């Protein structure tokens, strides 16, 4: 965990963890929930197979939760909801469900209610679900999973993460109600993050969305359009599978895997590699402009170089140099 994250008690940088569950391997990508770091969250959404949106059970839906919901809709990400902090005073389960249905989607369904009542509710989420329900009197896991994948069904779970209440039900739902995407045979990948390891080595985090990637493979792409978009061709030095701060080196990453690679110096968040197109321009844009004030005696060009390194990791910084005023903005 980053020192700033520990000090503030929040997530600032997206991180990943590898989890092995019965019949399922999961890569968990933890994204910032704080409004100030929304851009980091948006960059990660494009590589998700499914999202778990955490809602405060004590406060209900908040403005930033609605922003995240719009982003998930934009990137067509299937969503499960976990209503947290149910151990604290709040509106209550019934009132929260009404709020979710009214402000998010009618397909938000309480998966903690009796199965018969749940299936009756789910049958209203689509003609195919209604037909299956009328024919069989129930709904199969496959039918519900198809509704989740189509973003017509949004399973809702309630509990308290601090007290580990409700988590077993949420985790058990993943293999039952979340479909694994189908991937093509030819290589494609989505770059969602650029960072540096403790030694300063540049890391390109990407999800393989087709085929496979091998260490020492030669990749090519087009540079960041904001920086001129020059074509590049470079070799992958190492493939790393991260879980927290630790990683294992791999010779190959398959479709569906999230990994970090070294050796690439021109990649940028949102870039598509292989057959993958570049991501659309981000929906969230900075609203304020700041001037960087340096201490007396500091070299502005040296500071600019370091800030541009940060801008590789967060393109929304939009670092610029005004030659006339010799100011960094």
Give, region by region, the residue ranges found by the protein language model.
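Structural and coupling elements of P-loop NTPases
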Residues: 1-329
């Amino acid at each position: 965990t980053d020192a700033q994250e520990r000090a503030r008690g929040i997530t600032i940088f997206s991180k990943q963890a590898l989890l092995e569950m019965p019949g399922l391997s999961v890569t968990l990508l933890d994204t910032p929930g704080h409004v100030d770091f929304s851009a980091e969250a948006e960059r990660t959404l494009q590589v998700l197979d499914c999202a778990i949106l955490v809602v405060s059970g004590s406060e209900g839906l908040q403005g930033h939760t609605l922003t995240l919901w719009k982003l998930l809709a934009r990137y067509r990400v299937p969503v499960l909801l976990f209503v947290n902090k149910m151990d604290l005073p709040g509106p209550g389960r019934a009132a929260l469900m009404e709020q979710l249905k009214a402000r998010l989607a009618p397909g938000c369904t309480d998966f903690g209610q009796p199965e018969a009542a749940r299936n009756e509710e789910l049958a209203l989420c689509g003609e195919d679900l209604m037909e299956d329900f009328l024919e069989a009197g129930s709904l199969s896991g496959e039918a519900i999973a198809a509704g989740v994948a189509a973003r017509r069904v949004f399973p809702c779970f309630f509990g308290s993460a601090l007290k580990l209440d409700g988590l077993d039900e949420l985790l058990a739902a993943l293999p039952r109600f979340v479909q694994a995407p189908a991937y093509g045979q030819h290589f494609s990948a989505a770059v969602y993050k650029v960072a540096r390891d403790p030694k300063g080595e540049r890391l390109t985090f990407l999800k393989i969305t087709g085929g496979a990637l091998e260490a020492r493979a030669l990749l090519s792409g087009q540079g960041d359009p904001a920086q001129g978009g020059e074509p590049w061709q470079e070799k992958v030095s190492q493939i790393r599978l991260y879980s927290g701060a630790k990683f294992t080196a791999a010779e190959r990453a398959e479709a569906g895997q999230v990994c970090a690679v070294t050796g690439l110096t021109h990649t940028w968040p949102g870039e598509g590699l292989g057959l993958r197109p570049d991501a659309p321009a981000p929906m969230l844009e900075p609203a304020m402009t700041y001037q960087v004030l340096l201490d007396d005696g500091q070299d502005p060009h040296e500071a600019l170089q370091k800030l541009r390194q940060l801008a590789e990791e967060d393109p929304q910084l939009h670092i610029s140099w005004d030659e006339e005023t010799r100011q960094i903005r």
